[in-house]
Swiss-Prot record:
It comes from Homo sapiens. Residues 371-390 are annotated as: Disordered. This is Protein HGH1 homolog. The modification Phosphoserine is found at S17, S214. It comes from the Eukaryota. InterPro entries: ARM-like (IPR011989), ARM-type_fold (IPR016024), Hgh1 (IPR039717), Protein_HGH1_C (IPR007206), Protein_HGH1_N (IPR007205). The modification Phosphothreonine is found at T388. The modification N-acetylglycine is found at G2.
Length: 390
């Protein structure tokens, strides 16, 4: 990589170690360095993040990580530096090393992601979305958010940025949604999201239909699904204050023409949909929507509310249309819950049922056999694997 200038001064004498070569880049990354040399140095760093050994080499370099964060925002090197951090954070095996080298990295990335003037805020959000998939970095990020001013918490700022069109005119901030989904795996984040006085869930619901980004839709649906694990909030989620179910069902609905009797059983927002109504195109998002509804059926009152709002009708048509076997299987399980008999007394809350160890093992074996069957069904088809953004 001659263009990066990384080998300058390396000719003659014993060959320098890779770590020493990386250290030589630091003067070119400092504020005030010649623009062309700075750009070449950052391009070299970005190239190194394209392979495992390169990422491992960079992850432990605290000074280099800090230098990447401090590049001037308007420069092209800052863009490449932000992308290098996205690639570093995409490697779960390096998260511990990254945090050890730079414990303040999550907080600084969050500051960049939520700065409405920062041009590379989307890259900062993507790096955080990658980093927060693992428990330790996620906990560090939650601590950084909790350290924000009580009147304007970090989570509130995150939700506001996600839900405000044009919050940053130069960055779409779609990756704030998967970041929020990762954070919502933690009880403290769910407590914030489900606080009735904050109206956070209500602000997120319209984004389940966001047309311009599957990343944003998927992150929001993942967040809502995680909130549905809190069965003590199901009555509130399904009730008139939130009315979550139509927002989960609408992306699963197609252009089917129901009878008048069936139409009356559906929520108003799902009645008389246009003939060009399209279902959610992403199979992973469809599966999360089905899983969220399944969680809402964990209690007897929840099951009754889901039944009363005609969910079975939407799921019946989804099952007939669904091309993906794993989504179809999830749909079948939910339909069985809705049309099956109620559990015996004392077993009404499915999330609190204690499953004997031998039964749990049998269920795991059944799941394995189910997965093998799905793989056999898929085998003859020449599926093209979708690229996953880093």
């Amino acid at each position: 990589m001659g263009e990066a200038g990384a080998g300058a001064g390396a000719s003659g004498g014993p060959e320098a170690s890779p770590e020493a070569e990386v250290v030589k880049l630091l003067p070119f990354l400092a504020p005030g360095a010649r623009a062309d040399l700075q750009a070449a140095a950052v391009r070299h760093v970005l190239a190194l993040t394209g392979c495992g050994p390169g990422r491992a080499l960079l992850a432990g370099q605290a000074a280099l990580l800090q230098a990447l964060m401090e590049l001037a925002p308007a420069s092209a090197p800052a863009r490449d530096a932000a992308r290098a951090l996205v690639n570093l954070a995409a490697d779960p095996g390096l998260h511990e090393t990254l945090l050890a080298a730079d414990p303040g990295l999550p907080a600084r990335l969050m500051g960049r992601a939520l700065d409405p003037q920062w041009p590379w805020a989307e890259e900062a959000a993507a790096a955080l979305a990658n980093l927060s998939r693992e428990p330790a970095p996620c906990a560090a990020l939650m601590a950084a958010l909790a350290a924000a001013e009580p009147a304007d918490s970090g989570l509130e700022r995150l939700v506001r940025a996600l839900c405000t069109p044009g919050y940053n005119a130069r960055a779409p901030l779609h990756y704030l949604a998967p970041l929020l989904s990762n954070l919502s795996q933690r009880p403290a984040a769910r407590a914030f999201l489900l606080d009735p006085d904050r109206c956070v869930v209500q602000r997120l619901l319209p984004l389940t239909q966001y047309p311009d980004s599957s990343v944003r839709r998927g992150g929001v649906v993942g967040t809502l699904r995680n909130c549905c694990f809190e069965h003590r909030h199901h009555e509130w989620l399904l009730g008139p204050e939130v009315d979550i179910l139509p927002f989960l069902l609408l992306p699963l609905a197609g252009p089917e023409d129901f009878s008048e009797e069936e139409m009356e059983r559906l929520p108003v927002d799902l009645q008389y949909l246009p003939p060009d109504k399209q279902r959610e195109p992403d199979a992973d998002i469809r599966k999360m929507l089905v899983e969220a509804i399944m969680l809402l059926t964990a209690t007897a009152p929840g099951r009754q509310q889901v039944r009363d709002q005609g969910a079975y009708l939407i799921l019946r048509e989804l099952h007939s249309w669904e091309p993906e076997p794993d989504v179809r299987t999830a749909c079948e399980k939910l339909i069985q819950v809705l049309i099956g008999d109620e559990p015996e007394r004392g077993m009404e809350n499915l999330l609190e049922v204690q499953v004997p160890e031998d039964v749990e093992q049998q269920l795991q074996q059944l799941d394995c056999r189910e997965q093998e069957q799905l793989e056999r069904e898929l085998a003859p088809e020449p599926w093209v694997e979708r690229a996953t953004p880093t």
